[in-house]
């Protein structure tokens, strides 16, 4: 059976930690930030840990990154 391929888009956007959690950028920052609160903009910086259902999907995209 051939090897599974890693989705290159997922490889560029997400990282799996040593404990198995998936880290990715915060969503919802592309446009429309003028109506957001300063707290929302501040909290949306950096990265966040994905929820378990989302992390399971991303781990399926990266079979060798567990």
UniProtKB/Swiss-Prot annotation:
GO cellular component labels: cytosolic large ribosomal subunit
Keyword entries, A-Z: Ribonucleoprotein, Ribosomal protein
Gene3D superfamilies for the chain: 4.10.410.60
One Pfam family, short name: Ribosomal_L35p
Record-given protein name: Large ribosomal subunit protein bL35
GO terms of molecular function: structural constituent of ribosome
Keyword Ribonucleoprotein among record annotations: yes
Stored PROSITE patterns: RIBOSOMAL_L35 (PS00936)
NCBIfam families: rpmI_bact
InterPro entries: Ribosomal_bL35, Ribosomal_bL35-like, Ribosomal_bL35_CS, Ribosomal_bL35_sf
Family: Belongs to the bacterial ribosomal protein bL35 family.
GO biological process: translation
